[in-house]
Amino acid sequence: MAEKLKVELVTPYKKVLSEEVDEITATGALGEFGVLPGHAPFLTSLKIGELAYRKDGVSHHMALNWGYFEVENDTVTVLVETAEKADEIDLERAKAALGRAETELKGLTPEDKNFRIYEAALERALIRVQVAGKAARR
């Protein structure tokens, strides 16, 4: 059994992460899950949420926007629409997006065609604010 997991995280635009890590957690369609070296093969979809990994005793956090997560032979492959490292998130911009989404949602009902769009925008902004806050506390 390997002592580390090889993680490759890719968006349609670039490779965001290529590291050997001790453990990794993410938010799947059915909730949060964690993976350690030696994990059985596994494939799941990801929803808007946080990905966290520990490397050499240090925790790292990222905000993700939809994708897929696969584990095979101590290799983790993460394919996502977008990914932002905690220390790269502009907290003021994320808070502004959160405010805009909240304002738009106040005037809509679940039956409105734009409701789900702003609901997803709100969820993305919340995750970005939470993850950015974790970078500030390092």
UniProtKB/Swiss-Prot annotation:
Compartments where located: Cell inner membrane
UniProt keyword annotations, A-Z: ATP synthesis, Cell inner membrane, Cell membrane, CF(1), Hydrogen ion transport, Ion transport, Membrane, Transport
Bilayer topology term: Peripheral membrane protein
Protein's organism: Citrifermentans bemidjiense (strain ATCC BAA-1014 / DSM 16622 / JCM 12645 / Bem) (Geobacter bemidjiensis)
Cellular component terms (Gene Ontology): plasma membrane; proton-transporting ATP synthase complex
Superkingdom field: Bacteria
HAMAP family, sorted: ATP_synth_epsil_bac
Stated name of the protein: ATP synthase epsilon chain
Family designation: Belongs to the ATPase epsilon chain family.
Alphabetical list of InterPro entries matching this protein: ATP_synth_F1_dsu/esu (IPR001469), ATP_synth_F1_dsu/esu_N (IPR020546), ATP_synth_F1_esu_C (IPR020547), ATPsynth_dsu/esu_N (IPR036771)
Free-text function comment from the UniProt entry: Produces ATP from ADP in the presence of a proton gradient across the membrane.
One MF annotation (Gene Ontology) recorded for this entry: proton-transporting ATP synthase activity, rotational mechanism
Subunit record text: F-type ATPases have 2 components, CF(1) - the catalytic core - and CF(0) - the membrane proton channel. CF(1) has five subunits: alpha(3), beta(3), gamma(1), delta(1), epsilon(1). CF(0) has three main subunits: a, b and c.
Record keyword Ion transport present: yes
Main location: membrane
Pfam family, one: ATP-synt_DE_N
